[in-house]
Amino acid sequence: MHRYSPNSLYKLIHPHGRWFIKGLNQSATLYTTNLGSRLRFIAKGVNNLTVNVLDNRNPFSPSQIYAWRIDGNQWHRELASHRSWHIECKSANHLIEIITAGNSDLDRVWNGDEGFAITSIDAEQGKLISAPPVPVIDFIGDSITAGCWVAGHNASIDYRPESNYVGTAVDLLHATDVRIAYSAGGVLRQATGGVPTADQFLTKLDATTFWQANTPDLVVINLGVNDRRFSLDQFNASYDHFLSLVTTLFPSIPILPMIPFSQTFAESIRSLTKKHKLPLIETQGWCSSFTDDLHPDQSGATESGYRLAEKLSNWLK
């Protein structure tokens, strides 16, 4: 058996996305504060994998959840409270994907070290190697982008980042994703878990760790829903400022703002996107089925994911 440490795993994965090395309980972990963060690697000649994680939730939260799949097949979901799980590979070569798939608004991900933490992966025979590169799309957003409330009204257990509109779209595009998205967040409203507004979480991984931005093929922005309690003038100023930040951070990458599925601040987003000379993704009629009038349920997520993939395919050619 070979044990892959957090540092070894970090060297394997591409893109690094929002993963970083963080010390917890006097040991290194492969850590992320983002629901929907993904690992991709090849298991070469491995019989079985054991993934070891911390039960790192808030004491008042349900268990965090991870999901995994082999070769793009069915996703399987695992409770972090069990601290480990097995993946049967049966030798040969297989693409393994692991995604952070459930947490709670109570988890203090920003300043309380209650993000997702992988301690090691054990491989029985064979070895782990980096996966072949595929197109990378960064998605900046809120709980809808992260994958909350897709399967129902229960925190963590009903989250589905693996099959929400982002997960659906990247599968159809044979791409992968980096999610810069936090529940309840906006350009004016702070997110849950102690997370600040989007202008601040864009460039940081938690309260003390800055993010070295990746170089994706595309950047998609889906923000605005959570800012609806603020005035139009406030939103216009903050969204304008945020677009300036994103274009500065990704100066040579196509950046595509989306109108939220609820059409919140649609006219403002159209106007400001035009001001910044960016292409706009219109979404009127994309999603006809919701969990709670704002978050697409699985049917709505699949529907909107197909439509988004169709739009983004023109930018990945």
Give the location of each predicted region.
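Short glycine/proline-enriched coil/turn segments at helix->beta-strand junctions
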Residues: 45-47, 92, 172-175, 251, ...
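Conserved beta-strand scaffold positions in the cores of enzyme catalytic domains, especially
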Residues: 139, 177-179, 280-282
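Solvent-exposed, flexible loop/coil residues
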Residues: 122, 192, 298
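Alpha-helical cap/lid subdomain in secreted, periplasmic
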Residues: 71, 200-317
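N-terminal secretory targeting modules
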Residues: 1-140, 145-154, 158, 314-317
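Conserved SGNH/GDSL esterase-like catalytic core that processes O-acyl groups on lipids
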Residues: 34-36, 147-234, 263-264, 295
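A structural signal for isolated positions on well-ordered beta-strands in alpha/beta enzyme cores
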Residues: 97, 138, 178, 254-256
